[in-house]
Amino acid sequence: MMGCQTFSYDDERRLPLYLLNNMLGGPGMNARLNLSLRERHGLVYTVESAMASYSDTGCWSVYFGCDHHDVKRCMRLVLHELDRMMQHPLSERQLATAKRQLKGQIAIACDNREQYALDFAKNFLHYGRERDINVLLTRIDAITAQQIQDVAQQMFAPDRMQTLIL
């Protein structure tokens, strides 16, 4: 597992990081880390990234399962993908695809009544009101490639990363 401290629930950079996280290791088979570590190199059984935001801080992590002799190579490949996100801005097409995928996942999550209830409670606790899904979708549409790159540069510097190997 690799990860770093990240943004609080109220931080404006949280949503661009959420989109970036989804691109890197979200649930889709087209997530960058899945394509690199599993499909291209055949090194992992599973790979995913996750983020959690709290009132005062947050955390972001990458988890992968591999043979013990492949750990260092997998870590190098993860760092390579993070470096790509820091160094190369997304094309308009890549950004549009990522936004469309995330908005689709949100729409599907809204159909899950348990998830909807959890989201409702979380937003009520943090903001005292229900989250307006249309506002969220509009905010996702407003994310720029520059914001994604800025967040990647802020979050993924090698000196910020912590590792845990079991």
Describe the residue ranges of each PLM region.
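Short, conserved catalytic/metal-binding micro-motifs enriched in Asp/Glu and His
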Residues: Y18, I148, T163
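Short proline/glycine-enriched turn/loop segments at secondary-structure junctions
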Residues: V151-M155
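His/Glu-based metal-binding/catalytic segments typifying zinc-dependent metallopeptidases
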Residues: M1-A31
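A short, acidic, amphipathic alpha-helical segment used as a generic capping/interface helix at domain edges
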Residues: T144-D150
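M16 family metallopeptidases and their MPP-like homologs
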Residues: M1-F7, N34, R38-Q87, E92-I143, ...
